[in-house]
């Protein structure tokens, strides 16, 4: 991992009326270079996030020290001149200060134009972890992140209330997304039951989750707020010298305590066999309960964890693409096992 040897400009959010060459942006963020020429090599990185124009890895040499510098630039297009959640999060200076469990790439700055947000962060190298093997590490990091986020939100002036309100998980523009509406998949499950007798009658049983999820959402809405990363996938985590690095805040929300644990376990449930999932779930929940800050109610946090776990697991296990994937791999028995777990352990 290479980091810029000198601090960026005092304010890491810069406003521009139009896009400028990359070198101009870097000089604006790092004024100590005094406009000296930079020999930059760039490489596009993979990205499938909504509204992302591109993600690029830039390499160049610090003209003052001669040391190598590696920076990631992410361009996120705006809709109706409204910036992205991720750009707003990176403008929340100091929120991650004091973190000891996770490591985060330093944000060098955010450049806002009317049409896009450009986010510049340090480049992180490391080995992607086996997600079930880091359950305890994640539990400690998530508990710390929730504590830091809640403290930061409580310290904000009233003038930031509209911005934070717009980032809240319970705004309609988030809740209407397909991934948070598993009930849309029930007609497909009913058809699956007609085609395959081992799935007969399951759609009617899964309908019981509709009122349950409404109840859990109401309880979660009233619980303590914090920042929630919401995207604990292998591609967003790296291990470097024993430290766990968390990147990519494209799904960040003003969430609730417990949400990130549910997001992690929901993703694990979607991808792993039941034995692997159950072992990791037990390890995660035990460590999370121990690490949870005293300011939070344990029962409330675990209830919120259950809510987001179900949101994630129900949609990803019921959607037609998942059913087809299991059919092609001849693993419909495993899918049926996951359905039984959801119906038996979660209702």
Please report, for each region that a protein language model flagged, where it lies by residue.
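Active-site catalytic-loop/activation-segment of kinase and kinase-like phosphoryl-transfer enzymes
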Residues: 160-216
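Active-site activation/catalytic loop segments of kinase-like enzymes and analogous catalytic loops
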Residues: 258-295, 309-337
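Active-site acidic catalytic loop and adjacent metal/ATP-binding pocket
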Residues: 46-65, 212-259
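Short Pro/Gly-enriched beta-strand edge/turn motifs at strand-loop
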Residues: 33-42, 89-93, 181, 210-222
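Juxta-kinase regulatory segment immediately upstream of eukaryotic protein kinase catalytic domains
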Residues: 2-42
